[in-house]
């Protein structure tokens, strides 16, 4: 699946990632924070249980349910490891 990848910095210099199917807007319920485009039209295997290096769990299920998939607060990426 081709997706657009957004990133935002959280507390303690850790990053969260949000992916949406290519060309789709971030849904309104997730658009209230400062997301920055990281990459556009990236091929990812959304069938994976865990999408590394963005640390997103169950991307296919999240996209089906919400229209996007996001890094859990438990898996935020430290700045030195952030893609």
Predicted feature residues:
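Short, extreme N-terminal segment that most often corresponds to the first beta-strand
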Residues: 1-18
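Intrinsically disordered, low-complexity peptide-like regions
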Residues: 2, 23, 41-43
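Structured loops at beta-to-helix junctions and adjacent beta-edge loops in soluble globular domains
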Residues: 6-8, 22, 73
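A short, structured beta-strand/loop element
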Residues: 16-39
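Low-complexity intrinsically disordered segments
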Residues: 31, 37-83
């Amino acid at each position: 699946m081709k997706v657009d990848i957004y990133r935002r910095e959280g507390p303690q210099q850790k990053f969260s990632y949000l992916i949406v199917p290519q060309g789709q807007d971030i849904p309104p319920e997730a658009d209230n924070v400062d997301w920055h485009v990281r990459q556009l039209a990236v091929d990812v295997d959304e069938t994976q249980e865990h999408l590394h290096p963005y640390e997103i769990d169950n991307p296919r299920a999240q996209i089906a349910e919400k229209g996007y998939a996001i890094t859990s607060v438990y898996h935020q990426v430290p700045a030195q490891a952030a893609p």
